[in-house]
Amino acid sequence: MTVCIAAACDNGERIVTATDGLLSMGDVTGEGIPGKMLWYGDWQFMYAGTPSIFSLVMEEIENASINDPQVLSRRHVQETILHAYQKVRSRLASFPFLSPFNMTIEDFKQDGLNAFGETFHNEVLRAISDEARRADDQLLVTGWGMSPLSAMVYEVGPSGDRLHTKSGFGAIGSGSQMAYTMLILLEQARYRTLAETIFNVACAKFFSEKSKDLDVGKMTAVCVLRKRTGEDEADKACRQFVSLEDLDILRSIWDQHLRPRIPDEARIEITGIAARVNAGNITPHDMVKHFKAQQRINEKRGISSQAPLSPQSTKDDS
């Protein structure tokens, strides 16, 4: 599906977010520009799931804010997001079963029992519930309240909503567990610096590319957010994307120093261990890996791998 990550840093003064660029339309997937970061005011919205469903949720939020701009204040924004998510999810889950009767979910709750009778009403209710459980769309929303350090990392999904204030970071999508694992291993926390957090979040994104079904795209977007101050121009965005060149540097560091792999030195030892417990037999795969590992070790030590080492006489032949 995807991965979206957010982590507060500098004691809540900044938030670093990341996502991939993989889009899924039924059985078809492809990578384009990372369009999973959207803004409404200074709130950043990221989603995991179907783009069109996310658009429906955003439209509900926008309609609510037109009637009352305060619904997007720090005090009310979570309630607004949750209500919009629930409304869209309920409508989509009920539509296949109620639309043949020209009935909405509101109509069903009010008149369904009288209209259908208890037996059929309960069957329809179970069908709607089963359909709702199939939904896996998630939202991750970040921003600030009135306090300069009140960074909010808020998550909404099929199992409910969560506020990641204590940990300071959250992740959604199929790659979320891999992302969480890397953030925890790197000891990410709100007190981490901006530099450390950019690195940690990028590594969490790269690590998530090995998630279930390999459905996290390699294309990466990393954005640094900060709280708006009185000195900022009203129409100026309080965010900065990490450049593609810097993302390449981060991925190179990840590949060279942090990506999990069997070290060359370990490869030499484990090949011998396997041979000792397997009657001296070594698989062709292990032999090739062993040879290549030894070549790289020799290159590091400045030893030629073109010919085997042989002892040389130190006696003067003259």
PLM feature spans:
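Conserved short S/T/G-enriched processing/targeting/catalytic segments and their helical context
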Residues: 1-126, 132, 160-199, 237-318
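Short beta-strand scaffold segments in enzyme catalytic cores
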Residues: 2-8, 13-17, 133, 137-145, ...
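Charged, amphipathic alpha-helical interaction segments
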Residues: 11, 202, 206-209
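Short gly/pro-enriched beta-turn/loop segments at secondary-structure junctions
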Residues: 132-137, 148-151, 164-167, 217
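Acidic-glycine-rich active-site phosphate/pyrophosphate-binding loop
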Residues: 144-160
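Flexible, glycine/charged-enriched surface loops at secondary-structure junctions
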Residues: 194-198, 208-223
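Accessory, usually C-terminal, subdomains that scaffold auxiliary metal cofactors
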Residues: 204, 226-228, 248-254
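Extended charged low-complexity segments that act as oligomerization/scaffolding linkers
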Residues: 231-237
